[in-house]
Design a protein with these regions (language model features):
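Loop-to-helix transition at the N-terminal end of transmembrane alpha-helices
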Residues: 56-76
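Membrane-embedded alpha-helical modules
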Residues: 106-216, 220, 224, 334-445
Length: 445
């Protein structure tokens, strides 16, 4: 009994030394509960990400495993090196951009697309090393940042509606309503409303519950075939190490690479600031302890993710759910990472999830991201016009890159045209000029 007590005390002492629990006003029990809470809110990514990357021709079961691995790697690294209650996983939005635009629309092999993700992550790492990252965040206006986030939300929402069959291609009107009497369409719609209703009632696992319910209904209707629940981890060699660095390192993909870098920069940095602020760890300027380590972990995780066959990795805003129940240290993130490792043994479940079960999650994420448009000053046309152009051009041009490009250019046009040149930061001017050069010298040929 004494030995057991000594072992327990030793374990608690180690946790105290590594995570400084008392200093942060928390306990190991609270951190574990927070980890479980965060995990339940974001575990949907292991089912949705393979569905999306499968569109690019990637092995969905292998992607399921690599999604678990990179989520575990990034989250555990964030916990151990930055001691923050922030979990990481492949970014929703950039995975859709990779699959539907870079691979499907542009016709590039997925290996080349992974190369573009790699170079974008390297760019992000260099911005972090040379401390340019926060300079860019501070100097790019809120309207453009909101426009980018909302545009990706509209793009994801459109992909969700398409995957559910709610909208279909129409040569005369571009899109039209699908067959709303089809059971697959109805299940996709049901899945979305399950998420929306449960989320509005503050149920953290809303997305996971929706995927489980719609998959079970699909099984009852004969769309899903039961393949078991637990198995040894399948091989991931069909996707690991297949990144094409040489094929992706060309001027024609400069816009795509820049888009991966810029979106990840805003997404991850914004989430880190938001979650640490909610945890009471950030100051009035948005800076938080071990910020440098957190930014390095974020960048390195994306580089690693491209090598093992998954899309850009980012900090997850769902981490705020763990913070809301008391998570304050990296122990929360480590618990999330360990749970993702356990999920690897549930790979048969990934093969059972039908496309319409994941569609509801896409539409819901689209709603969350598009809601940021409320932050735009709609009374100031020099701010609202660029935000609107950025947001709507992403789904209408079927390209996140073009939406970002037209947003930056239109921002400069509006400020110059109204004589408000002082509102233009060097960062915005440089980015706009880069996109103009891309349009003139690359896109025109």
């Amino acid at each position: 009994m004494s030995q057991q007590h000594t072992t327990q005390a030793s374990g608690q002492g180690m946790l105290e030394r590594v995570f400084k629990l008392r200093e942060h006003g928390t306990t190991a029990r609270t951190e574990v509960i927070a980890g479980f809470t965060t995990f339940l809110t974001m575990v949907y990514i292991v089912f949705v990400n393979p569905q999306i990357l499968g569109v690019a021709g990637m092995d969905t079961i292998a992607v399921f495993v690599t999604t678990c691995l990179i989520a575990a790697f990034g989250s555990i690294m964030m916990g151990l090196f930055a001691n923050l209650p922030v979990a990481l996983a492949p970014a929703m939005g950039l995975n859709a951009f990779f699959a539907f635009v870079v691979v499907q629309a542009m016709g590039l092999p997925w290996q080349v697309g992974m190369g573009a993700i790699f170079w974008g992550a390297i760019g992000l790492l260099l911005l972090t090393i040379f401390r340019v990252r926060y300079w860019m965040i501070a100097n790019i206006p809120v309207s453009l940042r909101v426009g980018i986030t909302s545009g990706i939300g509209l793009f994801i929402g459109m992909m969700g509606l398409k995957n559910a069959g709610v909208i279909v291609a129409n040569p005369e009107t571009l899109v039209s309503i699908g067959n709303l009497t089809s059971h697959s369409v109805l299940l996709g719609i049901l899945g979305f409303f399950i998420i929306a209703i449960l989320a509005s009632r503050n149920i953290h696992a809303a997305v996971l519950v929706s995927i489980v319910v719609t998959t079970l209904l699909g099984w009852m209707l004969g769309d899903v075939h039961y393949n078991g629940i637990v198995s040894a981890p399948p091989s991931v060699m069909t996707v690991v190490g297949h990144v094409d660095l040489a094929g992706s390192f060309n001027l024609g993909l400069a816009g795509v690479i820049f888009s991966f870098m810029l979106v990840n920069l805003f997404d991850s940095s914004g989430t880190l600031i938001g979650v640490t602020d909610k945890a009471g760890l950030a100051d009035e300027k948005g800076k938080f302890p071990r910020m440098k380590q957190a930014l390095y972990v974020d960048s390195i995780s994306s580089v690693t993710g491209s090598f093992i066959g998954t899309s850009s990795v980012t900090a997850y805003i769902e981490s705020s759910s763990g913070v809301s129940v008391g998570g304050r240290t990296g122990l929360t993130a480590v618990v999330v990472g360990l749970l993702f490792l356990l999920v690897i043994f549930l790979s048969p479940l990934a093969g059972m999830v039908p496309g319409y079960a994941a569609a509801g999650a896409l539409i819901y994420v689209g709603v969350l991201m598009t809601s940021s448009l409320a932050r735009v000053n709609w009374q100031d046309l020099t701010e609202s016009v660029p935000a609107f152009i950025t947001a709507v051009m992403m789904p209408f041009s079927f390209s996140i890159t073009e939406g970002i490009a037209l947003g930056f250019i239109s921002y400069c046009v509006m400020k110059i045209g109204t004589g408000r040149l002082r509102d233009l930061s060097p960062c915005v001017i440089i980015v706009a000029l880069m996109f103009i050069l891309k349009i003139v010298f690359i896109d025109a040929h």
